[in-house]
Amino acid sequence: MPKIKTVRGAAKRFKKTAGGGFKRKHANLRHILTKKSTKRKRHLRPKGMISKGDLGLVVACLPYA
């Protein structure tokens, strides 16, 4: 049986946690930041977690994570 390729884009975006979940970065924090409030930017800063509905897709993209 051949090895399964890891989706490299997913490998750069998601990191597996000890509990089996995946960390991800929030969107909307790259550019056009002047019109966004400090509170909004601050809440986007910490890492988020992948939702249960998307977990299967991420696991399929990262077979060895």
From Swiss-Prot:
Provenance organism: Proteus mirabilis (strain HI4320)
GO BP field: translation
Pfam families per UniProt: Ribosomal_L35p
Name of the molecule in the record: Large ribosomal subunit protein bL35
Keyword Nucleotide-binding: no
The keyword Metal-binding is assigned to this record: no
GO cellular component, one term: cytosolic large ribosomal subunit
Gene: rpmI
Keywords recorded for this protein, A-Z: Ribonucleoprotein, Ribosomal protein
Recorded family membership: Belongs to the bacterial ribosomal protein bL35 family.
InterPro entries assigned to the protein according to its UniProt record, in alphabetical order: Ribosomal_bL35 (IPR001706), Ribosomal_bL35-like (IPR021137), Ribosomal_bL35_CS (IPR018265), Ribosomal_bL35_sf (IPR037229)
One GO molecular-function entry: structural constituent of ribosome
UniProt superkingdom: Bacteria
